[in-house]
Amino acid sequence: MVDDELTALVVDNGSGMCKAGFGGDDAPRAVFPSMVGRPRHQGVMVGMGQKDCYVGDEAQSKRGILTLKYPIEHGVVTNWDDMEKIWYHTFYNELRVAPDEHPILLTEAPLNPKINREKMTQIMFEAFNTPAMYVAIQAVLSLYASGRTTGIVMDSGDGVTHTVPIYEGYALPHAILRLDLAGRDLTDYLMKILTERGYNFTTTAEREIVRDVKEKLCYVALDFEQEMVTAAASSSLERSYELPDGQVITIGNERFRCPEAIFQPSFLGIESRGIHETTFNSIMKCDVDIRKDLFANTVLSGGSTMYPGIADRMQKEIVTLAPSTMKIKIIAPPERKYSVWIGGSILASLSTFQQMWISKQEYDEAGPPIVHRKCF
């Protein structure tokens, strides 16, 4: 049981951005890149107070002299030392709280290796000494945020995309599908196709510029072939973008060729189904009686669903795949970039949730595997 006076901290550690704040709030207080940067060069000025590592926005702003690394790849933490730095930064610099005074709700991608959540639990209790914690599945939180208990969530972030069917609040594990193709792969793909135009982007810092181009200018075409014809025939789809050094680049069909890869992964040389087929297959793995509810409640969540045109295209593709009489509704909430965090905030402030926390005492008795018993 957790004391009611204490506000929970809600931390959604995405592969690309970390969203953090307090349970009960309607938006995260801190949103910063999940990155750690280390200097590429030797410091020469004494007394400059140069650090051997920078986290988040500070790493982003000094990116020209740093090598940037993301400790979370495809939703799985690959570097625990850096991850601990990000959490430290979250608590002490961004939220300015003592983690040993608040219960902490963390999030993770479905179908993650079990050891991943055990290690998260261990670090929270042993390094940060938190009184209580919980690990929730990201897509389930997004559904909470949309005010539903039944539906299928297509959650696509920077590192991983997954489709999670949920019925009356329970995720159906046998029907969860995961696609290791998301925002970061689209950024890499845009870097590649911009090279064909003669623009060269190679370093980790330049990748961040391309990510910005992607976020500002890309969109999903309703009909890809038709859009390619339009782009070839006129310059109406061209847009320009000013680089940090003042050089202006022009981008045309790349605007929709880049996100097309989540519908056609073969563009990236990846042998897998696009998000529309993955969503459909996920629904078809469920019991025949509940499919109707899933088709009518298909919820998009995550930063890689923010492209203009994605909901219409998704609707069109799933209508093509599904039985002709089926009612299909794609829900794309405007705040879907943060819906995982918002769902976490809602969950952490529910009175019925308070007995779900893993307490320090339970952890001391059972060790890290307690997380599999209490969080599902």
UniProtKB/Swiss-Prot annotation:
Pfam entry (one): Actin
The keyword Cytoplasm belongs to this UniProt entry's keyword annotation: yes
Modification sites for Methionine (R)-sulfoxide: M45, M48
Description of post-translational modifications: Oxidation of Met-45 and Met-48 by MICALs (MICAL1, MICAL2 or MICAL3) to form methionine sulfoxide promotes actin filament depolymerization. MICAL1 and MICAL2 produce the (R)-S-oxide form. The (R)-S-oxide form is reverted by MSRB1 and MSRB2, which promote actin repolymerization. Monomethylation at Lys-85 (K84me1) regulates actin-myosin interaction and actomyosin-dependent processes. Demethylation by ALKBH4 is required for maintaining actomyosin dynamics supporting normal cleavage furrow ingression during cytokinesis and cell migration.
MF-aspect GO terms: ATP binding
Domain of life the protein comes from: Eukaryota
CDD domains, sorted: ASKHA_NBD_actin (cd10224)
Subcellular location: Cytoplasm, Cytoskeleton
Keyword list, A-Z: ATP-binding, Cytoplasm, Cytoskeleton, Nucleotide-binding, Oxidation
Cellular component per GO, a single term: cytoplasm
Subunit structure: Polymerization of globular actin (G-actin) leads to a structural filament (F-actin) in the form of a two-stranded helix. Each actin can bind to 4 others. Interacts with PFN1 and PFDN1.
Family recorded in the similarity comment: Belongs to the actin family.
Miscellaneous comment: In vertebrates 3 main groups of actin isoforms, alpha, beta and gamma have been identified. The alpha actins are found in muscle tissues and are a major constituent of the contractile apparatus. The beta and gamma actins coexist in most cell types as components of the cytoskeleton and as mediators of internal cell motility.
Function per UniProt: Actins are highly conserved proteins that are involved in various types of cell motility and are ubiquitously expressed in all eukaryotic cells.
Identification of the protein by name: Beta-actin-like protein 2
Lineage: Eukaryota, Metazoa, Chordata, Craniata, Vertebrata
